Amino acid sequence: MKQIALYGKGGIGKSTTAANLSAALAGEGLDILQIGCDPKHDSTRMLMHGTWIPTVLDLIRERGDEKITVDDVVYRGFRGVRCVEAGGPEPGIGCAGRGIIATFQLLERLNALKGDVIVYDVLGDVVCGGFAMPMREGYAQEIYLVTSGELMSIYAANNIAKAIARLSRRVRSRCTLGGVICNAKNIEGERELVDEFARRIGSRLIAYIPRSRIVQVAELQKQTVVEYAPESDQAAVYQELARTVYGNETTSIPTPLEMDELESFALEFVQV
C-alpha cells in the first residue's frame, strides 16, 4: 500500500489537485482512499459530485466514536474512490488539528486505512502537531509539496520541508519528500522559479499544472476535470501526475532554506 500526502498553503489548489490525482489513479484500476485533513472539509466534494459528506469530528460530537461504523464515515465517489473528511472544531472553539488525530484513531479502529493508495490532503499553512500527524506517525510515507510561484506559497512549502526534515530524524517516522508540484498562477517565470526552489531544498519538480479555465468549469459542474473533460489537455496533466506519483521511487530528506536564503532566492526571480 502506498500512502502519500499533499501539503500546501490554503487556497493553492491542493484539494483540486488531490481529487483529480485520486480520480486519475482510480482510472488505472487502483483502490483509492482520499482523506481530507482540512477544517474546510471540501477535499472530496468534487469526487462526491458536490455532496458535503459528514465529517468525522461532527459524527463524534453527535454520537461518540464508539457508535460510528465504517459506512458512517467512508463514502464512495467517482470511480469508487473512498472518501473521508476529518472536519474541524466549531468556530472559535478547540483545535483544528484534533480532527485529524480523531480521524486517524477512528479509521484505525474501523480497519479502514487500506487500499492500493491512500491520499492525504492536508492543510499546510501551520504544521502543528495535529496537521503533522500523517507525517509524524508514519502514515504518509511520501510527502508532495503543492505550491505556486507566489512567495507566501513558497514560504509555506519551505516550512513543510522543515517539518519533514525534523520528523525524519525520529525513528518512528518514515516520511520523505516525494517532490514538488507547481499549481501555476500564471506568474512570469513561475515554472523556473518552482523548479529551482525544488532543487535548492534537495528535491525535484515532478509536475507543472498549468492554470486552466476548465478547472473552474468542471467544479461548477461539481466534478473533477478527469471526469468532466477526460480527453482534455488538463486531464492529461493529472493523469501523468498520477503515473509519476504511483511509480515514484525517488524520495529525499529535504534541506529547507533559512529565511534569509528564502528572501534572497525570491529576489533572484523578481523583475524589479
From Swiss-Prot:
Its cofactor is [4Fe-4S] cluster. It catalyses: N2 + 8 reduced [2Fe-2S]-[ferredoxin] + 16 ATP + 16 H2O = H2 + 8 oxidized [2Fe-2S]-[ferredoxin] + 2 NH4(+) + 16 ADP + 16 phosphate + 6 H(+). The modification ADP-ribosylarginine is found at R98. InterPro entries: NifH/chlL_CS, NifH/frxC, Nitrogenase_Fe_NifH, P-loop_NTPase. PROSITE patterns: NIFH_FRXC_1 (PS00746), NIFH_FRXC_2 (PS00692), NIFH_FRXC_3 (PS51026). The reversible ADP-ribosylation of Arg-98 inactivates the nitrogenase reductase and regulates nitrogenase activity. [4Fe-4S] cluster binds at C95, C128. GO terms for biological process: nitrogen fixation. Pfam families: Fer4_NifH. Its EC number is 1.18.6.1. Binds 1 [4Fe-4S] cluster per dimer. CDD domains: NifH (cd02040). Keywords: 4Fe-4S, ADP-ribosylation, ATP-binding, Iron, Iron-sulfur, Metal-binding, Nitrogen fixation, Nucleotide-binding, Oxidoreductase. HAMAP family: NifH. This is Nitrogenase iron protein. It comes from Methanoculleus marisnigri (strain ATCC 35101 / DSM 1498 / JR1). The lineage of its organism: Archaea, Methanobacteriati, Methanobacteriota, Stenosarchaea group, Methanomicrobia.
